[in-house]
Amino acid sequence: MERISALGLDIGKKRIGVAGCDGTGLIATGLTTIERTSFQSDVEQLHQWVKEREAQILVVGLPYSMDGSLGFQAKQVQKFTRRISHVLQLPVEYVDERLTSVEAEAQLKSQKRFSTWDKGAIDRQAATIILQQWLDSRR
């Protein structure tokens, strides 16, 4: 079986949720939430996860508008992603992330792990959903 090493990213203005997968590519797991301070800091933290997980690809949630168009936030995500892809020298695949934060919050509530204070948990869970969708689409 081919080994898969991908990082799933939920990129927001304030935070980046990060998820990874097991080598079989079956299960995505939330890893961390990066508090965004500067591009350089974002890259350094992502680079550490890329090295640690031996990531071969970045799977990024793209926040399409409900009508399917690319709005302002989606274009910002693409711009940031192009930059990190270039610096980290990794390919990128996008996943439609509409409503993943809503789904993430619902999952955390059902698991009794939801806190209005921990926005990072939602971002991390959203990254997990994004990566899991991508993994499932490859089967």
From Swiss-Prot:
Its EC number is 3.1.-.-. SUPFAM superfamilies: Ribonuclease H-like (SSF53098). Keywords: Cytoplasm, Hydrolase, Nuclease, Ribosome biogenesis. It comes from the Bacteria. It is an enzyme of class 3 (hydrolase). One of its GO terms (biological process) is rRNA 5'-end processing. GO terms for molecular function: nuclease activity. Could be a nuclease involved in processing of the 5'-end of pre-16S rRNA. This is Putative pre-16S rRNA nuclease.
